[in-house]
Amino acid sequence: MRKARVIGFILSCFSILSVCAAQDEPKRAPSTAQERQRFLALTRKLEQAPLDKTLYDEKAWAKQWLEDIPDINVNICAPVLFGTDFLREQAGEPYKYTPQLSYQATFGEAAYIIEHPDKKGDTTAQYLAGVESALKAYSAILKSDATAKSKSLDDLLEKQKQGKLADFVRDSSKDCDDKKEGM
């Protein structure tokens, strides 16, 4: 009887380990060249027309695709996306288009990784690409909805015009990169 319990316990442990290992396995094979091109085209379309409802199905595909593929991993750093001022603004009345811009920043980072596979480890360059992509989308939103202004996003556009956006991103991302290194 005792031997049966020990064997049962061991088998239970193995089954738990196999479930845990299965969760670490990729959901699918690496991305294909065709999928990457589709994703890049969508990212550029969304920079120009982030509110285009005809792109919503493609956007849903892109979100799921990024979750599933094992070969493109995007790092998210909330302070970098739009800055701590933007995050503070969100505590009051949230900016209407935050979800669109957040996804655009993520898509912009992934697009950078696809276009620059040799820079997969350069998180600052990835963050910068994401912010630049989101700022393009923000500018496009303002063309269709002039009331959709955000002081912090306007400040980022100004930093971009002055050539100071890269410094801002580098400084803002230090906390995120420090946390990654400490893991």
Over which residues does each language-model region extend?
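Mature extracellular/secreted ectodomains of secretory-pathway proteins
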Residues: 54-175
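Bacterial N-terminal signal peptides
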Residues: 8-18
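Immediate post-signal-peptide N-terminus of mature secreted/exported proteins
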Residues: 22-64
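Positively charged n-region of N-terminal signal peptides that target proteins for export
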Residues: 1-5
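Non-catalytic accessory regions used for complex assembly or targeting
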Residues: 20-34, 162, 170-183
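Residues at structural and domain junctions
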Residues: 8, 25-28, 48, 92, ...
